[in-house]
Structure formats: C-alpha cells, structure tokens
Curated annotation (Swiss-Prot):
Highest taxon above the source species: Viruses
UniProt entry tagged with the keyword Phosphoprotein: yes
Residues modified to Phosphoserine: S84
Primary localisation category: virion
Name under which the protein is recorded: Protein Vpr
Any one Gene Ontology cellular component term annotated for this protein: host cell
Organism of this sequence: Human immunodeficiency virus type 2 subtype B (isolate EHO) (HIV-2)
Gene that specifies this protein: vpr
Gene3D superfamilies membership: 6.10.210.10, VpR/VpX protein, C-terminal domain
Pfam families named in the record: VPR
Record keywords, A-Z: Activator, AIDS, Cell cycle, Host G2/M cell cycle arrest by virus, Host nucleus, Host-virus interaction, Modulation of host cell cycle by virus, Phosphoprotein, Transcription, Transcription regulation, Viral penetration into host nucleus, Virion, Virus entry into host cell
Length: 101
C-alpha cells in the first residue's frame, strides 16, 4: 500500500489584511457617519455613553455599538426612510415608548 502524502495548506499569496482592531474601528466610524444622517445626534451620544459605561473603551463595546447601530439603521430603512432625522421635527422617534433614564 502506498504511503499517504502529508497535506500541506496552500501558501497565502494575498496581501496582508489589516488588523482586526483597526477593522472594527473603521466599521464603527462608517456606521456612525451613516447613523448621523438619520438619527438625532443626542440619541447617538446617549447610546454611545450607555455602551461606554457598560463595556468601557473595549473592542467588545465597539462590537455592541456596531450591532445596535446596524439594527437601528435596518429598522429605519425598513420603515421607509425619507431622509428624516428621527427625533427631530419631520420624523417620528421609534424609541419614544422607552422612558428616559
């Protein structure tokens, strides 16, 4: 019986990807800029402060903020975005049912 040839993974000839931490920061910045076009900046500041108080200045906190902003933007667009700024005149506030803390 022939001897098995050991498996060798292919060489990675692609360019090096940016570090994970930098990618998370870049994605958060892009989502934040998009969110500022659609939501009241005070709402986004309050959300950012909440996440910071809960997670501190960590990648976990950045990931949580990314997830929340993605969901908020998805629901906003799904509801028929007319480029209104939610929380200001001309747009309803989907978070109005939540009492302020």
């Amino acid at each position: 019986m022939a001897e098995a040839v050991p498996e060798i993974p292919p060489e990675d000839k692609n360019p090096q990807r940016e570090p994970w931490e930098q990618w998370v920061v870049d994605v958060l910045e892009e989502i934040k800029q998009e969110a500022l076009k659609h939501f009241d900046p005070r709402l986004l500041t309050a959300l950012g402060n909440f996440i910071y108080n809960r997670h501190g200045n960590t990648l976990e906190g950045a990931g949580e903020l990314i997830k929340l902003l993605q969901r908020a933007l998805f629901l906003h667009f799904r509801g028929g975005c007319q480029h209104s700024r939610i929380g200001q005149p001309g747009g309803g506030n989907p978070l109005s049912a939540i009492p302020p803390s």
